[in-house]
């Protein structure tokens, strides 16, 4: 957590590439946003690496919207290369295809592309070939659930069979998952840990040191714990009832400062924003996943400019957000308020508290974490319960100390929640906890079984038996997915969604939200069409159910709407196949309204997308 994991991984990659004569890396992250965020950093590293060896390297950003990334566009066909330059980074149109992109020397993308190497599907051999000459680096490993872990473990096992180095990064990884992934790699090599050797490795797999480096050396597991120790930071933990929030913020920010509020759902974030903006006005800002992509990028940039490293900080600010604030954003809060969530994620959020060495406003010199949403009866907020389950919330609440010493306490706290050690509960909640524990176990089992039955690639077999194990039967019972997005859906246990392009009506035409310029006559312009293609937001299957009963009927309605209103888009490569919706301006003209079946969609730059049905907010 803030101790240079990325730099360490890239240094390891350089050594491994040299030792094993490999050509590049694959750097995988949980989301498109985190992939975009680290892409310039990896491009700069790879440019220097290629230059040091006097060669060109082909680099690619790999996710569904990579073509819209400005740096990726600059790299296309060697924009960085001139006649006098003999090394560096470029890309090539040949590698631009979805199937061939993985063959580039250096690839940054969403982790899905790595997980797909464990899914039976067409072109699987090509995907494996793409990984065969790379060091694989996967960041934020703690962010993947039990369903994705099945594909992650199998993919790691195949990398072990090929002898491909894999570097896994996390500040808050439960030790059980650490052991499982190490075991998977060794099994791939045909060197799994035997039962009689487990005692020998007990101290390694049970270690709660931080920082910690665990690695395989042939068939042996080794560990390094003797790193330079940074001084522990003491974070004070306090319980906060939400009805005291405004009063608490008034007191905390009396002399200025930046408060972060991280909650578990978009709906809660929007509700708090509407409450607090009445008291604190323009000092309040909001960030979550339900903004148009371009708006979210703008908001993230403003956030980094205001409270990132070496930023000129505002006198007073309140930043409200969801889980997007806990992943890969190098921002700093003077005080942090958070919803209760599982311990590993809670510590990720704490990583944004007093992150940088700066002078703090009076009264905020000590890092304090306020936790909302705790329940003495273990009846947690509905959204938190749905996302994380009551079992992990209950254990986190029970085991959360009044003071956290970072980084010393990171691993012990995470392990205490995930190791299933029995906890003493009062009689009044004992049965509630038992029920939550049982539900958690069933949920994990369901996710694991579903993933294993979801076209999971079989284990690698090192012994050659042409009559039994061969490429001809490799993909028996595989499935042909009609799009890459549908393939991705098989390796993520995520809710289905519909991606739409959202624009505002202006007169008889349409344009971008907040711009008040009609661009409907400029769709044939390459740059305009590309900018339109960036105005996307995903509508969840829940919205589709409220609108038309199910997601398929919603898609069919949107397709008909586009044939009637946006037919010209089908002639433009950037927009062909896209689903657009045109919002009607409301009152202030900053807010747009769109009627989608039985629901009303409202959108504006400050609060994002809201969904109403019968005058009640639904999502």
Residue positions per predicted region:
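Walker A/P-loop
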Residues: 1-13, 144, 170
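Walker A/P-loop NTP-binding motif
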Residues: 6-23, 41, 156-158
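Conserved Walker A/P-loop ATP-binding site and its immediately adjacent core
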Residues: 23-47, 61-66, 173-177, 266
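A substrate-engagement module of RecA-like helicase motors
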Residues: 42-107, 111-115
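Conserved two-lobed SF2 helicase motor
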Residues: 101-118, 311-326
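Post-DEXD/H (motif II) to motif III coupling segment of the RecA-like Helicase ATP-binding lobe
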Residues: 129-135, 142-223
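C-terminal helicase lobe and adjacent C-terminal extensions/tails of nucleic-acid helicase motors
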Residues: 178, 232, 243-309, 333, ...
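Conserved interdomain linker/interface between the two RecA-like ATPase lobes of SF2 helicase motors
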Residues: 188-269
């Amino acid at each position: 957590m803030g101790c240079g994991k990325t730099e360490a991984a890239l240094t390891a990659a350089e050594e491994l590439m040299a030792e094993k004569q490999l050509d590049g890396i694959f750097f995988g992250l949980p989301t498109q946003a985190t992939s975009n965020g680290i892409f310039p950093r990896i491009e700069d590293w790879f440019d220097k690496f290629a230059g040091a060896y006097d060669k060109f390297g082909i680099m690619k950003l790999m996710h569904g919207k990579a073509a819209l990334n400005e740096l990726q566009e600059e790299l296309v066909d060697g924009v960085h290369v001139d006649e006098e330059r003999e090394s560096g980074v470029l890309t090539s149109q040949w590698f631009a295809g979805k199937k061939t992109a993985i063959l580039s020397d250096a690839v940054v993308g969403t982790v899905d592309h790595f997980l797909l190497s464990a899914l039976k599907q067409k072109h699987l051999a090509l995907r494996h070939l793409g990984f065969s000459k790379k060091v694989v680096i996967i960041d934020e490993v703690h962010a993947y659930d039990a369903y994705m872990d099945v594909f992650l473990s199998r993919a790691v096992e195949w990398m072990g069979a090929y002898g491909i180095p894999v570097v896994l990064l996390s500040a808050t990884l439960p030790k059980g998952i650490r052991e499982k992934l190490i075991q998977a790699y060794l099994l791939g090599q045909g060197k799994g840990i035997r039962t009689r050797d487990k005692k020998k490795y007990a101290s390694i797999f049970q270690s709660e040191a931080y920082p910690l480096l665990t690695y395989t050396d042939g068939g042996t597991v080794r560990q390094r714990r003797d790193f330079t120790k940074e001084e522990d930071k003491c974070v004070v933990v306090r319980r906060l009832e939400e009805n005291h929030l405004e009063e608490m913020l008034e007191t905390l920010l009396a002399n200025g400062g930046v408060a972060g509020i991280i909650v578990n759902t978009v709906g809660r974030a929007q509700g708090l924003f509407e409450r607090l903006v009445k008291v604190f006005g323009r000092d309040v800002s909001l960030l979550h996943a339900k903004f148009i992509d371009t708006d979210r990028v703008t908001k993230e940039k403003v956030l980094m400019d205001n409270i990132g490293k070496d930023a000129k900080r505002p006198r007073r600010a309140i930043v409200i957000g969801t889980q997007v604030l806990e992943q890969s954003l190098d921002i700093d809060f003077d005080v942090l308020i958070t919803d209760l969530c599982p311990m590993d994620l809670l510590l990720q959020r704490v990583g944004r508290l007093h992150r940088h060495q700066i002078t703090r406003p009076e009264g905020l010199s000590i890092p304090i974490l306020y936790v909302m949403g705790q329940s003495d009866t273990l009846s947690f907020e509905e959204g938190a319960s749905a996302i994380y389950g009551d079992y992990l919330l209950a254990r986190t609440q029970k085991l959360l100390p009044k003071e956290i010493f970072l980084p010393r306490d990171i691993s012990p706290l995470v392990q205490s929640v995930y190791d299933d050690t029995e906890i003493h509960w009062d009689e009044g909640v004992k049965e509630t906890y038992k029920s939550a524990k049982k539900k958690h176990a069933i949920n994990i089992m369901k996710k694991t079984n579903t993933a294993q039955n979801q076209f999971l690639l079989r284990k690698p077999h090192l012994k050659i038996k042409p009559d039994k194990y061969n490429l001809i039967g490799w993909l028996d019972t595989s499935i042909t997915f009609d799009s890459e997005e549908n393939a991705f859906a098989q390796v993520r246990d995520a809710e289905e969604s519909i991606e739409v392009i959202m624009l505002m009506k202006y007169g008889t035409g349409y344009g971008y939200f907040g711009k008040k310029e009609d661009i409907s006559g400029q769709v044939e312009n390459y740059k305009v069409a590309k900018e339109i293609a960036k105005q996307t937001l995903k509508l969840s299957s829940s919205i589709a159910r409220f609108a038309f009963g199910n997601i398929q009927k919603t898609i069919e309605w949107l397709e008909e709407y586009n044939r009637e209103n946006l037919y010209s888009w089908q002639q433009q490569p950037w927009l062909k196949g896209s689903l657009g919706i045109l919002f009607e301006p409301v009152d202030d003209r900053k807010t747009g309204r769109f009627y989608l079946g039985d629901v009303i969609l409202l959108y504006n730059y400050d609060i994002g997308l809201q969904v109403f049905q019968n005058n009640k907010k639904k999502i």
